[in-house]
UniProtKB/Swiss-Prot annotation:
Pfam families: SSB (PF00436). Homotetramer. GO terms for biological process: DNA replication. Keywords: DNA replication, DNA-binding, Plasmid. The gene is ssb. Residues 115-133 have a biased composition (Low complexity). This is Plasmid-derived single-stranded DNA-binding protein. GO terms for cellular component: nucleoid. It comes from the Bacteria. Residues 55-61 bind DNA. Residues 163-175 have a biased composition (Acidic residues). Residues 6-110 form the SSB domain.
Length: 175
């Protein structure tokens, strides 16, 4: 296994814009996300708090792209597992490069918390409906795919998806 290597990226961040969803000729959905991650620290010389934000280009495919387009909005917090990929193209004789995180069917996209506009409506629902949805998503995800990438896609029809995801995410922690 060490000869092949591991290419895995995990991000928890917030969307800078609404997802851009398009459909490729074979009918599959592709969504582009701009995800911001931030870290903060105290400057040793000045004592001031400092913050640095990194922007990540994330590309989702298939059902995950459709879910992102329907439920994610600017400011939403997401958990992403995917692969780092750099591609290049020629732009009038200049070679351009872009690095993206690809989330295919073996990857994961989970919505954390609720969208800012849905916050008041969705809050009471997780206690009643969150646990069963998480269990259903786990069962369905195992039946349809071998990976856990489909767990986030299963709750698509229910508007209370973000709350169900919170419980599903907590259940995945092994301790």
């Amino acid at each position: 296994m060490s000869a092949r290597g591991i290419n895995k990226v995990i991000l928890v961040g917030r969307l800078g814009n609404d997802p851009e969803v398009r459909y490729i000729p074979n009918g599959g959905a592709v969504a582009n996300l701009q995800v911001a991650t931030s870290e903060s620290w105290r400057d040793k010389q000045t004592g001031e708090m400092r913050e640095q934000t990194e922007w990540h280009r994330v590309v989702l495919f298939g059902k995950l792209a459709e879910v992102a387009g329907e439920y994610l909005r600017k400011g939403a917090q997401v958990y992403i597992e995917g692969q780092l990929r750099t591609r290049s193209w020629d732009d009038n004789g200049i070679t351009r490069y872009i690095t993206e995180i690809l989330v295919k069917t073996t990857g994961t996209m989970q919505m954390l918390g609720s969208a800012p506009q849905q916050n008041a409506q969705a809050q009471p629902k997780p206690q009643q409906n969150g646990q069963p949805q998480s269990a259903d998503a786990t069962k369905k995800g195992g039946a349809k795919t071998k990976g856990r990438g489909r767990k986030a896609a299963q709750p698509e029809p229910q508007p209370q998806t973000p709350e169900g995801e919170d419980y599903g995410f907590s259940d995945d922690i092994p301790f």
